[in-house]
Curated annotation (Swiss-Prot):
Keyword match Protease: no
Protein family according to the UniProt entry: Belongs to the metallothionein superfamily. Type 15 family.
Domain of life: Eukaryota
Annotated protein name in UniProt: Metallothionein-like protein type 2 A
Nucleotide-binding in keyword set: no
Pfam families: Metallothio_2 (PF01439)
């Protein structure tokens, strides 16, 4: 996730939001999520990388707290 001077992240509509939260397209995915894997009962599915994917495909904060590029 990219930040503008450590103080803002890109929010909805590719406008800068408060806090260093990345794109903001998936607000429920911006916080860390813990999960438990029980092996041997079902196939192991690792959903922990969803947050990385959501942030990587969105906006990045550029200079002067503007979003660059705007891909939301």
């Amino acid at each position: 996730m990219s930040c503008c001077g450590g103080s803002c992240g890109c929010g909805s509509g590719c406008k800068c939001g408060s806090g260093c939260g990345g794109c903001g397209m998936y607000p429920d995915m911006e916080k860390s999520t813990t999960f438990t894997i029980i092996e041997g009962v079902a196939p192991i599915n690792n959903y922990g990388n969803v947050e990385e994917k959501a942030a990587g495909e969105g906006c990045k904060c550029g200079s002067n707290c503007t979003c660059d590029p705007c891909n939301c």
